[in-house]
Amino acid sequence: ALPISRGIIVDNKGVKSYFDYSWSEQRERSKIYEADFDKDGIEEVAFIMAGGHGTGVSVERLIIFLLMDESGQFIAYEFTGETLQQEFEKIYDFQVDIGNWELRVIKDGNVERILDWENSSSYYRDGEFQIDYLNLISYEILDEKILMNMEVCIWTNIGGPGKGFPNDGGKFCFNVAYENGMFRLE
């Protein structure tokens, strides 16, 4: 069984705020950063923790803790997979050319890059596959900037690990803008 940590308690000068998060420390340690991420003159706390790990999956979670008011209580905002997907789809789209085993990455109506997945064509069965960009996600903090790295993969109906493109244009890096509990990819 994996060791599981449960709950986060933020203690601000004796005022405690509890957040019901759980995570496994089996693979990576959680990381905590303090900076003024939204440039409002007040420092926030960023908590990066393991969200999911397995064959073809490595997801980190990003949570920002913000001092709510003079009471000393904190509130937590998580950059959820749903929000990440909405933000990604505002910037990028995909076109698939099965005949040439290509995945075209579209930005602003133009092909930004072409990912060749011919090497994984033996996994392609009955026309079933899925383009995935939510299973390989990591974060890093540099000064007051939050950076997110993600990879695009092709998942097929065999249910095994997907074909990734880490060295062939399948990696994406974004600045994650945070303001008033909202996250945006830039």
Identify the role of each PLM range.
Residues 75-167:
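Short aromatic loop motif centered on NTY/YTY
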Residues 28-37, 135-142:
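Beta-propeller blade termini
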Residues 37-49, 143-151:
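Acidic/hydrophobic-patterned starts of short beta strands in beta-sheet-rich repeat architectures
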Residues 42-99:
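Extracellular-facing segments of soluble proteins and assemblies that are Gly/Ser/Thr-biased and enriched
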Residues 5-22, 64-79, 115, 179-182:
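Surface-exposed loop/turn elements that mediate protein-protein interactions on large endomembrane-trafficking
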Residues 164-186:
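Long, compositionally biased interface segments
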Residues 53-65, 158-172:
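Structural motif
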